[in-house]
Amino acid sequence: MSRKTVFPKVMCTQHPDSASKYIATQEEPGEAIEAAQIFGCDEYMPDYEGKATPYHQNVQVVSKFIEETDLIPGKDIIITPRAPSAVQENQFRQLMVMMSIAEANYNALEYSDVQAINEFVHPMTDSVREIIGAQQHMVDVSELAKKEFGFSMEVPCIIPLIEDAPALLHAKELAENTLFAWKGHFGTVPDKFRVFLGKSDSALSFGHVASTLSCKYAINGICELNSELDTQTGIIFGAGTLPFRGHLDLMNAENFFKEYRGVGTITLQSALRYSHKKGDAESLVKLAKARLPETPELFSAEEKEEIINLIGIFGASYSRIIRQLAPTINRIADLLPQQRDRLMHKGTGGYSRSAPDISGLVNLCRTDIGKELEASMPAEDLQLPRAIKFTGALYSIGLPPEFIGTGRALEEAREKLGEAACENLLTKYFPSLAGDLNFASEYLDLNVASRFLSSECLKEVSKDLDILHGAFALETSPEPSYRILVEMMQPDLLQAGSRGNCMDEEVSQLVCSTLTKMGKIRKALG
């Protein structure tokens, strides 16, 4: 089999992380054109996961490229929708998106013999059964299109999106077992297969360090598959601009490309396009096209074991604090602006993120570390907001989540795994950690954060910061205008402005305006 398949390098997405711009669904087809013609992206992702995206957006995007540009969808610009999860949302919405993929391909056939849409993303993937089931739905829709309209298309191939730390640690096995199951179920295997890895949700559940290590472990494993299987595998890496969500921006590009070697495609999210300096997004796209993919440094069996135990230690230290902060996070997240048309947070039409099944991680950790990780997890789902608002909420009270649990975990790792393991963490496994913490320290204000923390929580966070100051010589000096805004954050003010209270409209507007201004200064909502 030829190994010359070139995967797209930059996928433009509809993530609602811009602090400066709201984009309605009817504007998104135009955004797709802008992504290709202005920013230089070679892939665009119409997003139906948790969003009120209309059925016909896939058709609109494909038609707009055909009618208004010289770019051929499926050749010059790759269109890759993200369908909803049949488990987390409902199967009807998933089938709706698949029907719209078929319709978009049918309409495009009139203008080109190139199929417009050839892949689709499946979110929050946990199992081979889920992947094969969704792929079978796509086969069924393709057969229905042939039966009803006499229209034959190549069945679009699923891209599983893996988003929590335990699943990321089993990404290689999931991809490998999927391809074996594919052969058994469909009688053949695809000659190329992409896997989408998400940084944000694993960070939300396990913290910044555990999330980064989990993603790198997954990248490492999937890269190993390329030398073991006939199917060529590619990796899409979903990252935002703030460190907690990946730290993908022009200023940090060199660190990012070194940190995540092996990734073939990056996401260009809304914050970088609309909230960063004009020209930054275009420059990053050019850089990514020149650099990706870079050869990964593969880990040894001993290093993998060490990484897993580090993930367990950092995840436990983070989780013990975050469960205490959940009410505050939810209250602030409720007041952050909605920058895309999302489905309702609760009920049958939408969903929030719930706690992952950690058994797959606990079983890999050393026994004592696994037990502490289990003990750190909340007894029931916290129903936290989505990752962007989660991150924005913590930044808005002067406590960037990158710091939570990190100092204490570093000390614990030194005690339990030894000095060499900590040295490996800082020089080999996660060399960008110092840079990430220095960036986040510009938005750290413990005096303000202390207003929202219990005495126990404040004690633990203060210890985190003391250890990190000693280890990294951090300079915690918030930008002056940001300091003024964050000083305005008072628990009573938030309570007055939160939804569900009889609020004064001016107070509510003041709180929302302040939160938005802080987002603009840090160049991302979250």
Curated annotation (Swiss-Prot):
Its cofactor is Mg(2+). GO terms for biological process: carbon fixation; oxaloacetate metabolic process; tricarboxylic acid cycle. SUPFAM superfamilies: Phosphoenolpyruvate/pyruvate domain. It comes from the Archaea. Pfam families: PEPcase_2. GO terms for molecular function: magnesium ion binding; phosphoenolpyruvate carboxylase activity. It is an enzyme of class 4 (lyase). Its EC number is 4.1.1.31. Catalyzes the irreversible beta-carboxylation of phosphoenolpyruvate (PEP) to form oxaloacetate (OAA), a four-carbon dicarboxylic acid source for the tricarboxylic acid cycle. This is Phosphoenolpyruvate carboxylase. It comes from Methanosarcina barkeri (strain Fusaro / DSM 804). The gene is ppcA.
